Amino acid sequence: MAAWNDRDTDAMAGLITDDIVWADPALPEPARGVPAVQEFMRASCRAFPDLRFGEPDPPALAVTGDVVLWGWYMEGTHRGPLDPPGFAPTGRHMRVDGFDQWTMRDGRIARYRAFYDMTDVARQLGIVPAPGSRAERGLVVLQRLQARLGR
């Protein structure tokens, strides 16, 4: 958490294996290797310059063999491009709860998987319309039309 909050990509590199597989709902496919994870961190911090992680109270942590589950929350204000896919900054603040699953090898994270509600984040940022809104109903109409034309 400190590596993220300090924007310290070198500290992150020390926590993960060279062949890390990093899966996050914000990524279209897992990041593989230290440089890819560092770039994901940089891109996340460009999109959310005040991005911060915290622990719930009480902390949520479970360890079984080489697997660690860790609960957290993340918050930040969308002030830079969100890549991928390239959403323009909305200036809106988001906060979401989530947890990580780490598979450890030789004291470092070899496989990382984050779990959080990306749709909730998109709604908070105004990228996806609120449930029941006119915009959502319009998207439903467009999706149905696309499905009908695509058959």
Regions found by a protein language model. Give the residues of each.
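C-terminal and inter-domain tail/linker signature
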Residues: 1-151
